[in-house]
Amino acid sequence: LHIYVREGSGAKNLETLIKTMLDAGVCLDRCAFCTDDKHVEEIRKEGHISTCIRKAIALGVPVAKAYKMGSYQAAEFYGLKNYGAIGAGYRADIVFLDDLEQVRPLDVMKDGRILTEEDYAKDYSVPVPDELLHTVHVGEVTKEKIRLSCDGKTDVIQMNPHQIVTTHLVEEVPAENGYFKPDGVYNKICVVERHGKTGEIGVAPLKGFGVKGGAVATSVAHDSHNLIVAGDNDEDILAAIKGVEENQGGYVIASGGKVVDVLPLPICGLMS
């Protein structure tokens, strides 16, 4: 059994897991770090696995063990026999640091060569097959298709801060003429099948997202990557859905019945 201690953008579990294992005296030889999705701006600001190592050391993990969890043990778990250590027979992929506990990289060596600014500035773009640029197919989505019958208490999805695990609630939600009427507390969330296969749409009240005066939609939704949208009114929800389809993927913000901002991700609806 290998345990991956996760510390990403949506799910932050490192502090709880490390504290629990240290308190219980658990051997960390079968543990490694992972992020399981970390936003690029966070990677640029604070680092990637380096952040996990830094936090683990601050929580009391011995320095050498923290680095082993962030390198050798991870490579070992994945069967990457030539990675994760400095020695004969290992790839010369090395990070040079100025401080062990702060984990601040000074230089990076790849295959025995120190990388330069020119290496980072290279254009690594490649041709994109046309079929990968047309993957968002939702068809016509109307108000009728995103209605949710509601009379009294109903099932609600509760978001939890810094977690990807949600909580199932049964609560009284706002309704009008027998249908759920979203607001700033109880947003409406819709999952729209976007691969042109079934056209199915799932709808539910969402608590804890707190969008007011608009809607947010995205085609990045692990693991099936259907279109997910949440908002406090149907007009903006529909506008956001349409915006994602028109851009063939990405993140869309809608307000006042129209798209007000968009980050296009046209390659498979996932990448720029």
Q: What residue spans do the PLM features occupy?
A:
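Active-site microenvironment of metallo-dependent hydrolases
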Residues: 44-60, 64-272
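Histidine/acidic residue-rich metal-binding segments in metalloenzymes
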Residues: 1-5, 10-33, 42-58, 62-65, ...
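Active-site glycine-centered loops adjacent to acidic/histidine catalytic or metal-binding residues
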Residues: 36
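Short, glycine/acidic-enriched loop or turn micro-motifs at the edges of active sites
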Residues: 39
